[in-house]
Amino acid sequence: MSVRHSGIGMTSLRTRVRMVERLREQGIKDEVVLAAMGFIPRHLFVEAALASRAYEDVALPINYGQTISSPWIVGRMTELLRNGGSNSLRKILEIGTGCGYQTAVLAKIASEVYSIERIGPLLTRTRIRLRELGILNIHLKHADGMRGLPEAGLFDGIMMTAVIPEIPETLLEQLAMGGRMVFPKGNRKQYLCVIDHTTEGFVETILDEVMFVPILPGTINR
């Protein structure tokens, strides 16, 4: 099915290619990640008024006080989750579906993606968008992301797209042995972090300084 904002569909492939080239120059090296981002039309995940800026390396506002992360952040977090291809990503949990762009990228690198969003109307719009794009290996859930999705079993990768001061134990318990979690951590100062589940326990590594909206508890229905 063809889905596009009027006036930019013919240039979207060219601008995606340029975006991928820029990401490569900025240090994103995983060709699987770059191919996924080159395939997913980012302009379909932003508001129509901002569609002309969709391929700029900036975060853009979406509805309900949320943002779509910059392409570099999406590439960086996805590359970290894949860990150079050493992490077999059969099943991923994403906490914070938002507009669904990161979700769609994850769906290109994993067999199954489970994604949780606390804002009901935002999730409804995202569900329609992903269905129109024919992305069928995503399971969306309207719920409080702080508890994860224990009923779905263990995950090879977990990604959180909002900042949190500390990871709850309940989320660590959902990370499979050998799995990796990628998330922003902090308060006023925020850092991109990874947690690897190893035979010696959970090992945390602090990486880049970043800026994300905070994770919030509970759900919103309207």
From Swiss-Prot:
GO terms for biological process: methylation; protein modification process; protein repair. It catalyses: [protein]-L-isoaspartate + S-adenosyl-L-methionine = [protein]-L-isoaspartate alpha-methyl ester + S-adenosyl-L-homocysteine. The keyword Cytoplasm applies. Its main location: cytoplasm. The active site is at S69. One of its GO terms (molecular function) is protein-L-isoaspartate (D-aspartate) O-methyltransferase activity. One of its GO terms (cellular component) is cytoplasm. Keywords: Cytoplasm, Methyltransferase, S-adenosyl-L-methionine, Transferase. It is an enzyme of class 2 (transferase). It comes from the Bacteria. Its EC number is 2.1.1.77. It is found in: Cytoplasm. InterPro entries: PCMT, SAM-dependent_MTases_sf. It holds the Pfam family PCMT. Belongs to the methyltransferase superfamily. L-isoaspartyl/D-aspartyl protein methyltransferase family. Catalyzes the methyl esterification of L-isoaspartyl residues in peptides and proteins that result from spontaneous decomposition of normal L-aspartyl and L-asparaginyl residues. It plays a role in the repair and/or degradation of damaged proteins. NCBIfam families: pimt, PRK00312.1. PANTHER family: PROTEIN-L-ISOASPARTATE O-METHYLTRANSFERASE, PROTEIN-L-ISOASPARTATE(D-ASPARTATE) O-METHYLTRANSFERASE. This is Protein-L-isoaspartate O-methyltransferase. The lineage of its organism: Bacteria, Pseudomonadati, Pseudomonadota, Betaproteobacteria, Nitrosomonadales.
